[in-house]
Amino acid sequence: MKTKLNELLEFPCEFTYKVMGLAQPELVDQVVEVVQRHAPGDYTPQVKPSSKGNYHSVSITINATHIEQVETLYEELGNIEIVRMVL
C-alpha cells in the first residue's frame, strides 16, 4: 500500500483507527483481537451507534512504532467480515 502517511507521521506516535461495522456484539472484540496481534496493549475502545442503530463505529488508539504496522492494521481491520469501512 503506497501512502503519504509515512511523510506525515513521526514514529513512535499515537494513531487512532475508526472502524465502522455492523452493530453486532462481536464487532468490538474482533477489532481488539486484530489490534492486539500487531500492537499488544490494554485497550478501551469507544463505541458509538449510528442514528438508526444498524452500524457501530469503534475508535481505538494505538502506539504505532512504524508505518508497516499502521498499514497492516488498516488492511486486517478491513478484512473483518462485519466491518464496512476503516478510517
Curated annotation (Swiss-Prot):
SUPFAM superfamilies registered for this protein in UniProt: YbeD/HP0495-like
GO CC annotation: cytosol
Source organism, top-level taxon: Bacteria
Pfam families, A to Z: DUF493
Cross-referenced InterPro entries: UPF0250_YbeD-like, YbeD-like_sf
HAMAP family from the UniProt entry: UPF0250
Family (UniProt): Belongs to the UPF0250 family.
Name of the protein in its database record: UPF0250 protein NT01EI_2946
